[in-house]
């Protein structure tokens, strides 16, 4: 594939994702603002596996992803449990399921008895108050 083909495929994939919500009315500028905000809600949590399904687990060992969900990373719990995750639960429940299963897998692999508040590249950042991951499960 050449660059133009890859660009076209990426445009089509993003348009498919962004069209999960369709709006009417408003100016072109307002629509641009809305869909830019939608795009920002879809950047993370991102896929964490390599092309062969392997990833570094919560125990810092190499694991192969389970085929029942897509292993994801970057859960900034305090920032997203009241906004991004309720929205994604409605428009993309598979993504939310993937992230919650990823947090469970990380806790199981690491032996920790809690879900990470701000998981970053399958590591514990140890910051933020409370445990917003629990609110995302409910």
Model-derived segments and spans:
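Acidic/polar, glycine-enriched structural segments that form the non-catalytic walls/loops
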Residues: 1-71, 105, 113
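Residue-identity detector for glutamine
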Residues: 5-8, 84, 88, 109
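Alpha-helix capping and helix-loop boundary segments enriched in small/acidic/polar residues
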Residues: 25-28, 70-75, 87-94, 120-132
């Amino acid at each position: 594939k050449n660059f133009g083909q890859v660009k076209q495929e990426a445009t089509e994939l993003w348009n498919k994702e962004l069209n999960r919500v369709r709006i009417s009315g408003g100016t072109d500028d307002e629509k641009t603002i809305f869909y830019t905000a939608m795009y920002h809600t879809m950047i993370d949590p991102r896929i964490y596996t390599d092309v062969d399904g392997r990833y570094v687990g919560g125990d810092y060992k190499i694991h192969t992803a389970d085929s029942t969900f897509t292993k994801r990373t970057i859960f900034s719990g305090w920032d997203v449990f009241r906004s991004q995750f309720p929205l994604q639960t409605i428009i993309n429940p598979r993504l939310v399921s993937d992230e919650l299963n990823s947090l469970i897998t990380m806790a199981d692999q690491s032996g920790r008895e809690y879900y990470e508040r701000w998981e970053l590249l399958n590591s514990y950042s140890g910051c933020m108050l409370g445990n917003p991951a629990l609110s995302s499960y409910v």
